């Protein structure tokens, strides 16, 4: 399995502002 890279951003609305990151509630990963 691939270890997700944490983007250092939290996501409450389901979207992430950091480019290339996706919401894996409650944090953004890529």
From Swiss-Prot:
It comes from the Eukaryota. Keywords: Disulfide bond, Knottin, Plant defense. GO terms for biological process: defense response. InterPro entries: Cyclotide (IPR005535), Cyclotide_moebius_CS (IPR012324), Cyclotide_sf (IPR036146). The presence of a 'disulfide through disulfide knot' structurally defines this protein as a knottin. This is Cyclotide psyleio E. Belongs to the cyclotide family. Moebius subfamily. Probably participates in a plant defense mechanism. There is a cross-link at residues 1-30 (Cyclopeptide (Ser-Lys)). The keyword NADP does not apply. Disulfide bonds join 7-21, 11-23, 16-28. The lineage of its organism: Eukaryota, Viridiplantae, Streptophyta, Embryophyta, Tracheophyta. Pfam families: Cyclotide.
């Amino acid at each position: 399995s691939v270890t997700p890279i944490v983007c250092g951003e939290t996501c409450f609305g389901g979207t992430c502002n950091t480019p290339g990151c996706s919401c894996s509630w409650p944090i953004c990963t890529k």
